[in-house]
């Protein structure tokens, strides 16, 4: 891992609108990529961050530092990273709600290093993540909005109340409206919770399309799936949108944006990607 500077939030992307992995960052397609990736991940940024969290030292600078190391690790096993539309992350004066599809564990690790250098941010996340041994302390340190995923009405209340509270403090929220991680995108299973939160808080929505299935879903343990060396990792942020009326038009735009980006990327990456 690169040297960590206490209290300094790293910003390697600077004012770039687009980032694409280049030869110095990108490793060759790896043999046994899952073994190489997970051993480096657990012994590197995860262990380091858990130790800091146990001591009460998991602040934003540490969170971003670990996040950026995960980006480096996925590049080293031969997965090129592209991030488009980064100018839209800081295009609003105040906080916003990022609404994204949820494909794998990878975006949970990578997004802090992309977004936090521009603005304070946290996640809506399921309760099981904050109760994990060791890593749960990391999640709790981020002051997330916690949902149980068993009672939709209670989850909506938690997101609206907790989200408005954080947004008033200037903290943006990342929302994954799908009920579970999946490589497929179905607008019928992409709920309106992000749009509802933005409307209630009076803040813009920033749509985010992502393709992170280079980190697959495991059969026995979902978080430890196959690592598909050579498969690109992609993010694209759209321009911020204010919510008007009931938000149906904005919800439709978000779904169309994500669906069209995924279709384009799959075509570029190959039929079976």
Residue spans of the language-model regions?
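Membrane-anchoring hydrophobic helices of lipid-metabolizing enzymes
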Residues: 1-95, 110
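Catalytic core of membrane glycerolipid acyltransferases/transacylases, capturing the structured
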Residues: 37-40, 45-52, 92-151
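Hydrophobic/aromatic ligand-binding patch that stacks against planar heteroaromatic rings
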Residues: 114, 138, 165, 196-197
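Residue-level preference for the first positions of well-ordered beta-strands
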Residues: 95-97, 170-176
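Active-site metal-binding loops of divalent metal-dependent hydrolases
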Residues: 179
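C-terminal functional extensions of proteins
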Residues: 239-267
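Membrane-interfacial amphipathic helices and adjacent loop/beta segments
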Residues: 54-86, 119-161
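A cross-family acyltransferase "interaction/gating" segment
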Residues: 85, 135-136, 172, 183-249
């Amino acid at each position: 891992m690169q040297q960590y500077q206490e209290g300094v939030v790293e910003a390697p992307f600077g004012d770039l609108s687009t980032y694409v992995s280049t030869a110095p960052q990108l490793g060759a397609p790896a043999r046994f990529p899952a073994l190489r990736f997970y051993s480096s991940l657990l012994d590197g940024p995860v262990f380091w961050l858990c130790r800091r969290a146990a001591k009460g030292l998991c602040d934003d600078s540490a969170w971003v530092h670990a996040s950026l190391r995960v980006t480096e690790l996925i590049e080293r096993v031969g997965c090129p990273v592209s991030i488009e539309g980064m100018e839209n992350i800081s295009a609003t004066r105040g906080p916003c709600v990022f609404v994204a599809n949820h494909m794998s564990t990878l975006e949970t690790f990578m997004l802090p290093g992309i977004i936090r250098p521009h603005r304070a941010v946290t996640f809506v996340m399921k309760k099981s993540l904050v109760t994990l041994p060791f890593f749960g302390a990391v999640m709790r340190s981020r002051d997330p909005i916690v949902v149980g995923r068993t009672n939709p009405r209670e989850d909506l209340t938690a997101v609206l109340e907790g989200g408005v509270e954080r947004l008033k403090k200037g903290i943006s929220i990342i929302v994954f409206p799908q009920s579970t991680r999946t490589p497929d995108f179905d607008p019928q299973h992409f709920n309106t919770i992000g749009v509802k939160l933005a409307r209630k808080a009076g803040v813009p929505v920033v749509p985010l399309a992502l393709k992170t299935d280079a980190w697959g879903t495991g059969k026995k343990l979902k978080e430890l799936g196959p690592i598909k060396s050579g498969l690109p990792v992609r993010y694209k942020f759209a321009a911020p949108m204010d919510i008007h009326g009931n938000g149906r038009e904005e919800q439709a735009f978000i779904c169309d944006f994500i669906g069209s980006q995924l279709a384009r990327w799959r075509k570029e990456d190959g039929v079976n990607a």
